[in-house]
Regions:
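Membrane-interface interhelical linkers
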Residues: 1-26, 56-82, 131, 198-239, ...
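Glycine-/small-residue-enriched transmembrane alpha-helix faces in small-molecule transporters
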Residues: 2-46, 153-178, 318-328
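Hydrophobic/small/kink-forming positions within alpha-helical transmembrane segments
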Residues: 25-30, 60, 84, 88-92, ...
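Juxtamembrane C-cap of transmembrane helices in multi-pass membrane transport proteins
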Residues: 29-42, 47-50, 92-103, 109, ...
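Hydrophobic/aromatic residues within transmembrane alpha-helices
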Residues: 38, 47, 97, 103, ...
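Helix-helix packing/entry segments at the starts of transmembrane helices
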Residues: 107-112, 179-195, 246-280
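C-terminal transmembrane-helix exit sites in multi-pass transporters
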Residues: 113-138, 273-292
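Hydrophobic transmembrane alpha-helices of multi-pass small-molecule transport proteins
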Residues: 132-149, 290-309
């Protein structure tokens, strides 16, 4: 029997969609903050391998509930694989410096992705970039410099690493828009989980076989340690991360199926506020006033970009994929 949660809604329900969006974003931001908190006890490669294994199991279970295992295989394999590789690079850059910077700085760097979409949409998709989107690009870039401020006393170039995550996420969006618009969300999720599992396995095996210099391991252990000791409790923590990821994605996808994405997508930038809140609760850190201003400028730039995109082509993205932010 097909699970009713996957049935497409028969009518728009904006308030329900808003609640689903807020709940989904809060779970995704909590997952990201908890991964940073747990980073000293694991490695990126171990996290990717085990968490993505749980994601694959959950995806298989959802396919069984939703109508069949055929939903797990994409119609066009290689674009889906390319998207998975881009998202793996995004995750590496997003979490790679998690022990050196705050969770708010991680989120700020990632949420520059609408600016990269604006830069790449012309040469990649042949879209015309108007004055509004150019203005949003300048505003967002200025906000990024304010929020991250890597050149201040005590600043670090690690603060710029999540901006690379924003670039790779933008590339993923363009691949999704051009080649994967008709794919099943479960197929896309399954392929991403498979790519994450393979990259996690490759990184762990490679770094165990060819040890990184000790100075690198001490400076960035989350990346340059292949496979630290694994406890049963750690596996349980990874399962919780996977569950948060799955539930958050389900609520976000359902939100965009239940209301018009033209007004929901800008609200997705509340992720930055949730991340700041979790940073305060878990790490007792709070963004400085200039960082708040920079985050607001990035959010404003993203909102302008989203609104102009909807005005240009209201059907430019499938409902379940129209939102902002990292979803894997």
């Amino acid at each position: 029997m097909k699970f009713s949660f996957f049935d497409r809604p028969s009518e728009d329900r904006p308030m329900l969609a808003l609640c689903l969006l807020f709940f989904g974003v809060s779970l995704m931001s909590l997952q990201d903050s908890l991964i940073k908190l747990f980073a000293p006890h694991t490695s990126f490669w171990q996290l990717q391998l085990i968490r993505s294994s749980f994601n694959m199991l959950f995806a298989i279970g959802l396919a069984a509930l939703a109508g069949g295992f055929h939903l797990l295989w994409p119609r066009r394999l290689w674009p889906a694989v390319a998207r998975g590789v881009l998202l793996a690079a995004c995750m590496l850059c997003f979490f790679g410096a998690s022990q050196q910077i705050t969770v708010a700085q991680m989120a700020t760097g990632l949420y520059t992705y609408p600016l990269f979409i604006t830069l790449l949409a012309g040469p990649v998709l042949g879209e015309r970039i108007g004055s509004w989107r150019i203005g949003a690009l300048v505003l967002g870039a200025a906000g990024c410099l304010l929020a991250l401020d890597p050149f201040a006393d005590g600043g670090s170039y690690f603060q710029l690493v999540p901006v690379l995550a924003g670039f790779f996420y933008a590339c993923n969006v363009l691949v999704l828009r051009r080649y994967c618009r008709t794919e099943s969300p479960l197929a896309l999720a399954f392929v991403v989980a498979l790519i994450f599992m393979l990259t996690g396995l490759g990184g762990a095996v490679g770094l165990e076989a060819f040890k990184a210099p000790a100075s690198w391991q001490q400076a960035v252990p989350f990346i340059f340690v292949g496979w630290p000791p694994l406890a049963i409790g750690t596996v349980g923590v990874f399962a919780c991360f996977s569950a948060l990821n799955l539930i958050g994605n389900l609520f976000l996808s359902r939100a965009y199926q239940t209301a018009d994405s033209s007004w929901l997508a800008p609200l997705d930038f509340i992720y930055l506020l949730f991340v700041a809140m979790w940073g305060r609760v878990l790490f007792e850190s709070w963004p400085a006033p200039l960082a708040w201003l920079g985050m607001a400028m990035i959010a404003a730039a993203g909102i302008v970009t989203a609104m102009r995109e909807q005005r240009r082509d209201p059907s430019s993205a499938p409902p379940a994929q129209a939102g902002s932010g990292r979803r894997e």
